[in-house]
C-alpha cells in the first residue's frame, strides 16, 4: 500500500480529540513536510534549471493534476503573470475536469488518460515544452497520460508525488518523490501531501523566474502595476534599490512608463529610457547584467 494511504498511528483517536488537540496534531504533522522535502532539493533545483533552459528557448510549462493536486497546479500558474509579467500562455495549469473542477468535485475525471492528451494537443504542446505532473499517489491516470504523452513527443517532464517508486516517477525525466507519510485522516492528501506539492511548485516557479531575471536583488521588478497596492509597492522598490525619495521614485516611474526595471536602470546609470530598453534587451531582461553591460561601455 502507498504510504499516503497508510494509517497514521498518531491520529487513530482523532474523532475523540477536542479542537485544540486536532489543530496541534495537524501543526506537528505539517512541520514534517519541509524535512521531507530536504532530500529532494537537488532534484527540484535540476527541474528549475530545466524550466529555465526551455523557457529561454521559447518553450512553455504545463502543470497537470487532478483534484487537490490540479487545483494547486492551477493556483501556482495563475500567480505568475501578475508577479513576473510572463504571458499567460507560458505557464499553464491543467486540471482533470477542466476549470469547473476548480470550484466543484469532479473526481471521476482523474481516471481519463485521453482527455489530458487532447488538452495538451489543443495547446500545441511540443518537445520544446515542459510537463510537470502533480499527483500525490504517483498513479493518477490523468497525470500518467500527460507524462506518457510528454515522453512520447520528447518534451521535458517532471513529476511531483508523495510516495516512493511511483508510476509517475518512472515516466518522468526528473522524479520528485517526497515521503510525506500517512495523513491524520487516512488518504486525505489535501493535507501534508498538498502542502508539499504547493511548496515544491513555489520553489520551481520562483527559482525559475529568479534565474530568468524576473527579480532584481529580492524585489519583484517585473510585476504588473494592476492596482494601488502594487503601484505603491513599485514606489517602495524604487526607493529600496536606488535610494530615491518617494516623490523622486514616483517621477522615475512616470518617466519609465511604469517600467520598474527601466526606472531602476535609468536612476542608477543616468541613462535614457531608450538606452535602458536596449541594454535590458541585450541581457534578456536581467537588470543587474544590463547595468553591468552599460557600465562596461556597451
UniProtKB/Swiss-Prot annotation:
What EC designation does it have?
A: 4.2.1.126
Which PROSITE patterns does its entry note? SIS
Query: By its UniProt entry, which InterPro entries does this protein fall under?
Result: Etherase_MurQ (IPR005488), MURQ/GCKR (IPR040190), SIS_dom (IPR001347), SIS_dom_sf (IPR046348)
The catalysed reaction is: N-acetyl-D-muramate 6-phosphate + H2O = N-acetyl-D-glucosamine 6-phosphate + (R)-lactate
Q: Where is the signal peptide?
A: none
GO molecular-function annotation terms? carbohydrate derivative binding; carbon-oxygen lyase activity; ether hydrolase activity
Q: What class of enzyme is it?
A: lyase
Instruction: Determine if Lyase is one of this entry's keywords.
Output: yes
User: Its domain of life?
Assistant: Bacteria
Pathway(s) annotated for this protein in UniProt = Amino-sugar metabolism; N-acetylmuramate degradation
Active-site residues are 79 (proton donor), 110
Instruction: Sum up the protein's function in the record's words.
Output: Specifically catalyzes the cleavage of the D-lactyl ether substituent of MurNAc 6-phosphate, producing GlcNAc 6-phosphate and D-lactate.
PANTHER family given for it?
A: GLUCOKINASE REGULATORY PROTEIN
Which family, according to UniProt?
A: Belongs to the GCKR-like family. MurNAc-6-P etherase subfamily.
Q: What is this protein called?
A: N-acetylmuramic acid 6-phosphate etherase 2
Q: To which species is this protein native?
A: Bacillus licheniformis (strain ATCC 14580 / DSM 13 / JCM 2505 / CCUG 7422 / NBRC 12200 / NCIMB 9375 / NCTC 10341 / NRRL NRS-1264 / Gibson 46)
Amino acid at each position: 500500500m502507498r504510504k499516503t494511504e497508510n494509517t497514521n498511528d498518531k491520529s487513530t483517536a482523532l474523532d475523540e480529540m477536542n479542537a485544540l488537540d486536532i489543530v496541534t496534531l495537524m501543526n506537528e504533522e505539517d512541520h514534517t513536510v519541509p524535512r521531507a522535502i530536504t532530500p529532494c532539493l537537488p532534484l527540484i533545483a535540476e527541474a528549475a534549471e530545466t524550466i529555465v533552459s526551455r523557457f529561454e528557448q521559447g518553450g512553455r510549462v504545463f502543470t497537470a493534476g487532478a483534484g487537490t493536486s490540479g487545483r494547486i497546479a492551477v493556483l501556482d500558474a495563475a500567480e505568475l503573470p501578475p508577479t513576473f509579467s510572463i504571458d499567460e500562455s507560458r505557464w499553464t495549469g491543467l486540471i482533470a475536469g477542466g476549470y469547473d473542477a476548480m470550484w466543484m468535485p469532479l473526481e471521476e475525471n482523474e481516471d481519463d488518460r485521453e482527455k489530458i492528451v487532447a488538452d495538451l494537443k489543443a495547446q500545441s504542446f511540443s518537445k520544446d515544452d515542459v510537463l510537470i505532473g502533480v499527483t500525490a499517489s504517483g498513479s493518477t491516470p490523468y497525470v500518467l497520460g500527460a507524462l506518457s504523452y510528454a515522453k512520447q513527443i520528447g518534451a521535458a517532464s517532471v513529476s511531483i508525488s508523495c510516495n516512493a517508486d511511483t508510476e509517475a516517477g518512472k515516466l518522468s525525466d526528473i522524479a520528485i518523490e517526497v515521503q510525506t507519510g500517512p495523513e491524520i485522516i487516512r488518504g486525505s492528501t489535501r493535507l501534508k501531501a498538498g502542502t508539499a506539492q504547493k511548496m515544491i511548485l513555489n520553489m520551481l516557479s520562483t527559482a525559475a523566474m529568479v534565474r530568468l531575471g524576473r527579480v532584481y536583488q529580492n524585489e519583484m521588478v517585473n510585476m504588473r502595476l494592476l492596482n494601488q497596492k502594487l503601484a505603491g509597492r513599485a514606489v517602495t522598490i524604487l526607493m529600496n534599490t536606488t535610494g530615491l525619495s518617494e516623490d523622486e521614485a514616483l517621477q522615475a516611474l512616470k518617466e519609465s512608463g511604469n517600467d520598474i526595471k527601466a526606472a531602476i536602470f535609468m536612476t542608477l546609470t543616468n541613462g535614457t529610457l531608450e538606452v535602458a530598453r536596449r541594454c535590458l534587451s541585450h541581457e534578456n531582461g536581467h537588470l543587474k547584467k544590463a547595468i553591468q553591460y552599460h557600465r562596461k561601455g556597451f
